[in-house]
Design a protein with these regions (language model features):
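Low-complexity, glycine/serine/threonine/alanine-rich intrinsically disordered linker
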Residues: 1-189
Length: 189
């Protein structure tokens, strides 16, 4: 859950949490972590939800489907090979989760850092090329490797199919990004 949530937040530049993580005991407030500055602040404000029920709950996306339950291996480890399979049912649950993320009522320009780079209407008439230009860096970051032209074409054709059916650009890109977030290549498999 932590890895998926952090990966989605990093990929989309989310300014809110994907979903609540009650097992996350310590919570920081004040956005102290800024590695580009090379400095740590003199004071860090940290809350502990487990010990103080009145601690702030961070803002998060609304209406998110619960994270699919993994099979737990012996002794609490979740990295044993026989437990790391991805069944069709689990993949379907991840697809539902990813679609609920991009269709959240507060998934918009205020909460999504890459909104203008990915979801906003392009300022060009060559929409097909704009889709490819937007998806290439997103796919490379999501899949952590250089992507092939065939992969780029597959995802850009998917987005274009929505546009041909009369769907607006933002909705088409949301559906495509939802597919990226549900791809086994995004799950570190």
């Amino acid at each position: 859950r932590f890895q998926y949530s952090n990966s989605v937040r990093d990929l989309l530049g989310l300014k809110v949490s994907v979903f609540s993580l009650p097992e996350q005991v310590a919570r920081e407030y004040g956005n102290y972590y800024q590695p580009e500055t090379g400095k740590m602040p003199d004071v860090v404000k940290v809350g502990n939800r487990a010990l103080g029920k009145s601690q702030l709950i961070e803002p998060r996306l609304e209406g998110i489907t619960p994270y699919p339950q993994d099979l737990r291996a012996e002794h609490g480890y979740d990295n044993q090979a026989d437990q790391l399979s991805l069944s069709p049912i689990l993949l379907e649950q991840f697809l539902e989760l990813s679609q609920s993320i991009v269709n959240s009522s507060n998934f918009n320009a205020k909460t999504v850092g890459v909104w203008n780079d990915v979801f906003a209407n392009p300022e060009t008439d060559d929409v097909e090329n704009a889709i490819k230009e937007r998806l290439r860096p997103l796919l490379q970051q999501a899949f952590r490797t250089k992507i092939s032209e065939a992969t780029l074409r597959r995802y850009s054709d998917y987005a274009s199919s929505f546009l041909r059916d009369g769907t607006d650009f933002t909705t088409a890109m949301k559906a495509t990004v939802g597919g990226i977030l549900a791809s086994p290549r995004f799950f570190y498999l």
